[in-house]
Amino acid sequence: MFKQLIKTTLTNSRSFSTNTGSGSKIGNIIGKIGIGKLNHVAIATPNLQESMDLYKNVFGADVSEPVNQVEHGVTTVFVGLENTKIELLHPFGDKSPIENFLKKNPSGGIHHICLEVDDIHHAVKTLLAENVRIIDPTPKIGAHGKPVVFLHPKSMNGVLVELEEK
């Protein structure tokens, strides 16, 4: 299902010239970068404790303790679900990208989706060769201790997509 979602997003992206027949360029890119499962959906929240309580008390979900991600300017909390996770994001520090998001969306909302890939460096190289915009093509260590990059929303139909190495 998520491979189809990404295929549809990439097919509709202005950054690609596409062939919708079998063996399409987009299908080949997806295969080349080794997209795996949906790792998490990230939600920016203006009130971290309130959001933690919501998922714990209303849905009975396992909720982690908050962790400050100094390098990324966010505090993260992971909500464990049966087949994926929700990452709650709250601003941390003076230069938090989440602060800007919350200025535009004061009550919070979906910030990004995260998909797993086999090899982050190979995925970056392949996507750059196909003119997909990557916010910073140098992988950084993400909240799970694994390398990540973010694909620019302008290349992904308005969706910020995080790729995380399996």
Curated annotation (Swiss-Prot):
One of its GO terms (cellular component) is mitochondrion. Keywords: Cobalt, Isomerase, Metal-binding, Mitochondrion, Transit peptide. Its EC number is 5.1.99.1. GO terms for molecular function: metal ion binding; methylmalonyl-CoA epimerase activity. Residues 37-166 form the VOC domain. Residues 1-23 form a transit peptide. It is an enzyme of class 5 (isomerase). Co(2+) binds at residues 40, 112, 162. It catalyses: (R)-methylmalonyl-CoA = (S)-methylmalonyl-CoA. CDD domains: MMCE (cd07249). It is found in: Mitochondrion. SUPFAM superfamilies: Glyoxalase/Bleomycin resistance protein/Dihydroxybiphenyl dioxygenase (SSF54593). One of its GO terms (biological process) is L-methylmalonyl-CoA metabolic process. Its main location: mitochondrion. It holds the Pfam family Glyoxalase_4. Methylmalonyl-CoA epimerase involved in propionyl-CoA metabolism. Belongs to the methylmalonyl-CoA epimerase family. This is Methylmalonyl-CoA epimerase, mitochondrial.
